[in-house]
């Protein structure tokens, strides 16, 4: 029987790459893992891939290009680092391979599956922003659909144990990329992103706070409905994504103005949304919702590409 699933490569055998491999192998009807790529021959991810019968290389992207399996690769997930992504992308694009970038490199357009995938379905490189971006930008977008968002601020709190060397090396890129995507994808006029590595034991699941500053006359019921519908949409591919409590509203009145970036001292309406993200526990512990939402979003994008009929590359 023929196997019509799209063959993908995963570059990076750490937490994100390994979780993504297991998600695809367990759940995907449209994709198959054609190669797992690392640089540490002793990594758990490469060892696990070998046990599962996945072709592997510990020679990085150059090793991937030399693999017989590379001829069938149509999409490559990059789960390494922002610095390495530029090199990987150049080499893969030369062979017509679509790249789904799970680093903050932002070479391609920012994509949040529930917000703007359809606009970038044919992009050769798709950037998945960051874990904090995947969790919070849908909420900023949900508010901005109802009322102009003058300023949005997100705070992503993740367990220190879930932050591997790649995450820690990309902290500056995380804040920069997420802040830009709050504007470009979320629709806010101004934005800021903060990440907190929480050392608490036992480890806590990912928690995110989204603040949006809107005009005082904004429709509270419409904002609440829009946010709740967006949460349901994200839950379709991240079941552990949820509101921690009801959407909160605070009227900022004359005499109690707040200093809003880009606006100065202002009155208006402050919208606060509190989220938590529990991981599915495929490879990573359930507290690592920050990694789970990235792999789930990346998988969703790849499956939509596979099911879209858009031509994908690779050597013939």
Curated annotation (Swiss-Prot):
<dbReference type="GO" id="GO:0051287">
    <property type="term" value="F:NAD binding"/>
</dbReference>
<dbReference type="InterPro" id="IPR036291">
    <property type="entry name" value="NAD(P)-bd_dom_sf"/>
</dbReference>
<feature type="binding site">
    <location>
        <begin position="162"/>
        <end position="170"/>
    </location>
    <ligand>
        <name>NAD(+)</name>
    </ligand>
</feature>
<keyword id="KW-0560">Oxidoreductase</keyword>
<dbReference type="Pfam" id="PF09290">
    <property type="entry name" value="AcetDehyd-dimer"/>
</dbReference>
<comment type="function">
    <text>Catalyzes the conversion of acetaldehyde to acetyl-CoA, using NAD(+) and coenzyme A. Is the final enzyme in the meta-cleavage pathway for the degradation of 2-aminophenol.</text>
</comment>
<keyword id="KW-0058">Aromatic hydrocarbons catabolism</keyword>
<dbReference type="Pfam" id="PF01118">
    <property type="entry name" value="Semialdhyde_dh"/>
</dbReference>
<dbReference type="InterPro" id="IPR015426">
    <property type="entry name" value="Acetylaldehyde_DH_C"/>
</dbReference>
<feature type="binding site">
    <location>
        <begin position="13"/>
        <end position="16"/>
    </location>
    <ligand>
        <name>NAD(+)</name>
    </ligand>
</feature>
<keyword id="KW-0520">NAD</keyword>
<protein>
    <recommendedName>
        <fullName>Acetaldehyde dehydrogenase</fullName>
        <ecNumber>1.2.1.10</ecNumber>
    </recommendedName>
</protein>
<dbReference type="InterPro" id="IPR003361">
    <property type="entry name" value="Acetaldehyde_dehydrogenase"/>
</dbReference>
<feature type="binding site">
    <location>
        <position position="290"/>
    </location>
    <ligand>
        <name>NAD(+)</name>
    </ligand>
</feature>
<comment type="similarity">
    <text>Belongs to the acetaldehyde dehydrogenase family.</text>
</comment>
<feature type="active site" description="Acyl-thioester intermediate">
    <location>
        <position position="131"/>
    </location>
</feature>
<dbReference type="InterPro" id="IPR000534">
    <property type="entry name" value="Semialdehyde_DH_NAD-bd"/>
</dbReference>
<dbReference type="GO" id="GO:0009056">
    <property type="term" value="P:catabolic process"/>
</dbReference>
<dbReference type="GO" id="GO:0008774">
    <property type="term" value="F:acetaldehyde dehydrogenase (acetylating) activity"/>
</dbReference>
